[in-house]
Amino acid sequence: MHIRYQQLIAICLALMFAPEVSAYENHQMWDKVRVGGKLCMKSHEHHGQSPLWVSKKGARAYSRRAWERFTTWEYGKAWGKLRLAAGRRERCVQTGKRWMCSIIARPCRPWRRRRRR
């Protein structure tokens, strides 16, 4: 019984930390293209959406944060900055007195030259 408990703990710890390690490698499965001083995903887009919000400004801010949080979680901090994203499209819709906004963009990160050894 004691061994099973230790195995269960080991499995739980592995599951907790495995996504964090692999999250930074997820970007390698997508084709990338250089756009100015940035490296961008060629065709892979991320979405951020707000729930119904009292103000348009609040809904836009929420959708932008949602995009940045998910992209940062999946690819790391370098890829999760909306101001660097390419092909950005935002749309807000008013339903009654409330607003809902969504944003779609391709993640980019600053271009870094690889050092020659």
Question: What is each of the regions a protein language model found here?
Answer:
Residues A10-M16:
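Bacterial N-terminal signal peptides
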Residues V21-R117:
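Domain-level marker for long, solvent-exposed, non-transmembrane regions
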Residues M1-I9:
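Bacterial N-terminal signal peptides that target proteins for export
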